[in-house]
């Protein structure tokens, strides 16, 4: 009789442990809600195949280099330095820069030097030396389809080439990737650039989702009176887009931002939230290699 009661008691205890209820001493579900920020889950169930291949984020930033964003600004509108935030979190990013900013004695370079004592060229050299990637965002930063209609395809191709030359002159590295301003470029010009060896980034559904940029919409959050900024915050808007892609089985993302002080301010929380979801941060070149190895 006593032995029977003991066996029953052991069975009940084991059942409680295996049931997984934290309330009765069981083990919590590893795929629970995780940390939640502003209603967006920062931890998500992940297929075992993705865990083996890796959950990847490539952070990219357009329109620089802007030293006051990269290294921070003080005064009436203080802002954290984007490069300092990335370094502190052990994240390497890719910068799609505008060639004219890397030309000595331009207004942009003089303006930055006067304001924070660092020129655009100096900023690019510093970051390249710290392991960041620099890629092509044209020389002139104008809308390329309009430029092609007015000036011809050769002008567009030459402007992209000038941007690449400016980057190589400063960093010593030939750009391999190109992002058109606002992703707007004619099919013919894009084909020609790809023929010349560029990978042209896009948001078009013509490409697999893993190779499409995720538009952060951060430019809508800039200025004193932003209109259209994702709610409740920029980082939550990005996380929602990541969640939507995860629901479609996509766990690799190229996130497209701009060199803006408001974006730099959002980065610490966004990086923490993405790390909590199991993501690893890589440069764009590393991302492309790893995604290719996954067969995406």
Enumerate the language-model features and the residues they cover.
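Bacterial N-terminal signal peptides
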Residues: 9-17
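C-terminal domain-boundary segment and adjacent tail
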Residues: 34-51, 87-90, 129, 261-296
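Signals and flexible motifs at protein termini associated with secretion
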Residues: 19-25, 30, 86
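Short catalytic/ligand-binding loop motif for oxyanion handling, primarily in non-cytosolic enzymes
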Residues: 67-68, 102-105, 142-146, 184-189, ...
């Amino acid at each position: 009789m006593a032995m029977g009661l003991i066996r029953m008691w052991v069975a009940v205890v084991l059942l409680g442990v295996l049931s997984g209820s934290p309330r009765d001493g069981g083990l919590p579900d590893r795929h629970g809600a995780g940390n939640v920020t502003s209603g967006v889950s920062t931890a998500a169930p992940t297929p075992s195949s993705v865990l083996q291949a890796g959950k990847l984020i490539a952070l990219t930033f357009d329109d620089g280099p802007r030293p006051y964003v990269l290294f921070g600004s003080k005064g009436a509108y203080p802002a954290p330095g984007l490069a300092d935030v990335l370094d502190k979190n052990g994240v390497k990013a890719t910068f799609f820069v505008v060639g004219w900013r890397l030309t000595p004695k331009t207004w942009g370079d003089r303006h930055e030097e006067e304001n924070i004592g660092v020129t655009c060229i100096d900023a690019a050299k510093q970051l390249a030396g710290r392991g960041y990637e620099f890629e092509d965002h044209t020389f002139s930063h104008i809308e390329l389809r309009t430029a092609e209609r007015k000036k011809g395809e050769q002008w567009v191709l030459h402007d992209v080439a000038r941007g690449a030359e400016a980057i190589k002159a400063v960093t010593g590295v030939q750009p391999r990737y190109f992002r058109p301003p606002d992703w707007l470029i004619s099919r013919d010009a894009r084909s020609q650039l790809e023929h010349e060896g560029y990978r042209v980034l896009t948001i078009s559904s013509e490409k697999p989702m893993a190779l499409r940029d995720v538009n952060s919409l951060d430019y809508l959050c800039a200025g004193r009176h932003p209109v259209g900024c994702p709610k409740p915050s920029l980082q939550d808007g990005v996380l929602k887009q990541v969640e939507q892609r995860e629901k479609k089985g996509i766990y690799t993302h190229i996130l497209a931002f701009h060199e803006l002080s408001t974006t730099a301010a959002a980065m610490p929380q966004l990086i923490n939230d993405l790390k909590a979801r199991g993501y690893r941060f890589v440069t764009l070149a590393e991302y492309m290699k790893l995604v290719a190895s996954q067969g995406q």
